[in-house]
Swiss-Prot record:
It is found in: Cytoplasm. One of its GO terms (molecular function) is metal ion binding. The gene is groES. This is Co-chaperonin GroES. Activity of the GroEL-GroES chaperonin complex requires Mg-ATP. It comes from Escherichia coli (strain K12). Heptamer of 7 subunits arranged in a ring. Interacts with the chaperonin GroEL. Can form asymmetrical complexes, composed of one GroEL and one GroES, and symmetrical complexes, formed between one GroEL and two GroES oligomers. The asymmetrical complex is the functional unit. It was suggested that the symmetric heterooligomer may represent a transient intermediate in the chaperonin protein folding cycle. Another study shows that the symmetric heterooligomers are substantially populated only in the presence of proteins that cannot be folded by the chaperonin. One of its GO terms (cellular component) is GroEL-GroES complex. NCBIfam families: PRK00364.1-1, PRK00364.1-2, PRK00364.2-2.
Amino acid sequence: MNIRPLHDRVIVKRKEVETKSAGGIVLTGSAAAKSTRGEVLAVGNGRILENGEVKPLDVKVGDIVIFNDGYGVKSEKIDNEEVLIMSESDILAIVEA
């Protein structure tokens, strides 16, 4: 993928969500909600502070994150792959193995 996010932006590929319940029932429509977990594919250089310094991001390429799938998250198709572009502040947590 040939994309470089700017500043505090992060490119995330959404993880596939389970389409079966624990009891084996196939979920469809609103019951099969979109996942709010994904893998970080690219990160920007960092957030520019008021004093002009750049604060590096806490997330890095390869991290699995939980994110807020809200207003500030933009969905784009790049190289025939659906990705999300978001600010680091839209990321709620890093999943540690």
